[in-house]
Regions:
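A short, N-terminal "cap"/entry segment at the start of jelly-roll beta-barrel domains
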Residues: 1-42, 137-172
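Short acidic-glycine-tyrosine-enriched beta hairpin
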Residues: 14, 75, 80-98
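Conserved short histidine dyad/triad with adjacent acidic residue
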Residues: 25-31, 44-60
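Structural motif
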Residues: 27, 66, 73-75, 82, ...
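Ligand-binding loop in jelly-roll beta-barrel domains
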Residues: 37-39, 75, 95-121
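Short, conserved beta-strand element in jelly-roll/cupin
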Residues: 45-49, 59-78, 114-115
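Tight coil/turn sites that cap or link beta-strands
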Residues: 51-52, 88, 96, 106
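A contiguous, mid-protein "functional segment" used to position or interact
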Residues: 107-158
Length: 172
């Protein structure tokens, strides 16, 4: 991935030219991260597999997230409301509010996620590095690792707030 220079020249990221991250449960490509945008924003494209969980209920204290559904449908929990977000839907999930997402359908869902500021984009790489270091394999070990890394980044995860309709899609 080409980085912005000190003079912040425009940057175009071609299809497939982002950084692929082997994050548990997602096909993920980091298109721009905080290092390429001087910390302002990160853009991540992710595919949520059919009938799978995307992210557990969590609260960011330092970032806002924006989900734009490109293909398929995801369900988004925002505080106590659940929305079926089809292609073309934009969800603005601001800091300080609980949110989660999952794919209850039989087809993959693809989303473009913007995170501001962009420094949280490194979270995904941090999780993968910690998983490799610890050798975590089970769903419980992976979940515990994600929770630890999230906590270091001022993001709280609330596994007890998973909606009943999303529980069948949790990793086992």
């Amino acid at each position: 991935m080409k980085e912005f220079t000190a003079d912040r020249k425009p940057l175009v990221v071609a299809p497939g030219a982002g950084r692929h991250v082997d994050f548990p449960g997602h096909a993920m490509e980091v298109l721009l991260d905080g290092g390429t945008t001087t910390g302002n924003v990160a853009f991540v494209e992710l595919t949520v597999a059919p009938q799978s969980f995307g992210a557990p209920p969590h609260i960011h204290h330092d970032e806002d997230e924006y989900f734009y559904v490109l293909e398929g449908e995801v369900h988004i929990l925002s505080e106590n409301q659940i929305f079926a977000a089809q292609a073309g839907t934009l969800a603005a999930l601001t800091r300080g509010y609980l949110h989660a997402f999952w794919n209850a359908s039989n087809t993959p869902a693809r989303m473009l996620v913007a995170i501001a500021p962009g420094t949280f984009g490194g979270f995904f790489d941090d999780v993968v590095a910690q998983l490799r270091k610890s050798g975590a394999k089970t769903a419980a070990e992976v979940t515990a690792t994600i929770e630890q890394v999230a906590k270091r980044r001022n993001c709280e995860i609330y596994p007890d707030r998973v909606p009943d309709e999303a529980k069948p899609f949790l990793p086992r």
